[in-house]
């Protein structure tokens, strides 16, 4: 049975398709790839899940598989399509609205791919953080309990809408911060995310319907702290 695509994916696909049709009808002087230097071919492939989707308490295999196959992998496919269209376009001669539309969708698809990979890497864990990350969370939020409360509350505040909650390292301030993002293009400038919570409806509606808060609670019980710890230590060393 076909799976209904979320509005964000439908809109993105429609935009890419419209740009492709428009690019195909441009005058030859605008559409010729040879009019500008050739672009190296780039092909993105979905990153394999690092866990068994049938073994994540509170999140069903059906939900996680649909999320991975349709939303994450769909973003990868969309990014490949946009990249190919840009490579074939004489960007110096193309109308500005064509370039603007393709570059906007390229950013959305690229960030969707990258943040989804962090989201899946953030799952299938449990327990509590340890070591330098635990110390930093206590230092920057007052306590681990306070961080949990703020992170979960931010996710629940997005329930019924869409977006992301990211725990990010700020190289500027040398501290951890929870950031709110209404779409794939809103992130902390210079921030390095180490943990991602997907609050788009496709991440929970199949299991929880409108009960977004219950999904957030399930996520909080499944955080893979070893992944967050490794990212935190790497980014902290770099700054």
Regions found by a protein language model. Give the residues of each.
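N-terminal secretory signal peptides and thylakoid transit peptides that target proteins
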Residues: 1-18
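An amphipathic alpha-helical core segment
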Residues: 155-211, 215-226
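Low-complexity, Gly/Ser/Thr/Pro-rich intrinsically disordered linker/tail segments
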Residues: 226-227, 231-239
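All-alpha RGS (Regulator of G-protein Signaling) helical domain and cognate RGS-like helical scaffolds
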Residues: 37-43, 70-73, 80-178
